[in-house]
Amino acid sequence: FSVLPNSRGWLAGRVTLDDNQYLYDNSRRFTLHVPEQRNILLVNGSGVDGAYLRLGLSTELSSSSARFNLEEVSETALSASVLGQFDAVVLNGVTTLSSGERAAVTAYVNGGGGLLIFPGDDMQLDDFNGLLSDLGAGRITGISAGSASGQSVGVFDRVDTDHTLFEGMFESDLSGRTPQLEQPVFFRMMNYVPAQGAEQTIISLTGDVPFLQEIRSGQGSVLMFGVEAGVRWSDLPVRGLFVPLLYRSLYYLSATASVSGESMLTGSGMQLRLAGVPGATRITIRDEAGQEFVPEQRTVLGAVVAELTGSFFIPGTYDVLVNNDVVRRIVVHPDPAESNLAL
């Protein structure tokens, strides 16, 4: 089953089973974080305009269920960008990727970041294939073009409508027929050959040519389109499909990092790292009854580490407060050994 949260921020909940012989382990608490907004870095290639992407992510066209804070830079600024500050990164027609930039992007994805790639006219295939190799993915072999002006190089053939990307996008068809996507006209298409690793083709064209490919690497994910985000390669950006597909792609990618709060067992301890918190800041832990506990804390590079241990922590949900603001929610679970009635 699935549940859609109706608010943002740090949320707490529980899953409960029917009563049985031992009642105290029939519920399992959890916490999750639904961000107020998702920070997106849009990196435009030299001479590439991100107008269609900006328009597609504008508040006037996108749903209110998620808010995107878009920061736009040219590809020359990629090496100086701190990727970890963003929930997803878009490479829009980027031409070249240095070895340092490839290493930074790979580390970002492996650490849980989301990457969206649109090809471009002048992209250096060796640079992008180097990045794809680092991510354990396949290879770009070239660009296909139609044999005549205005002739499409292919049409949508197979669509994985069961993918999370399309959740709730199509109405149920009682006849069992597969929903059909609007068919854009493709003038040019990037040719991509998948590897045998953790990747899947979400949308393919006739001839089994990937149009939208997902690549999993480490804790993160990459979505790669077969066309650029303008109207030179296709008319996709002026089709009704473009905005929901772009929106859902970034929503999906920006959620690839873990959104669950930390947890520990009763009687154990935990070192909780809070990034970006000044060393002199007082951290407070508050339980469900409103009682507060001030843990020992120490300053490390770029963060504060709080030592959570002691008799204060019994099964339940706890708020972590910095200057009276909830910055984290954690769960203390009962020891599983307590559920073993044979002991």
Label each residue range with its predicted role.
Residues 1-343:
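N-linked glycosylation sequons
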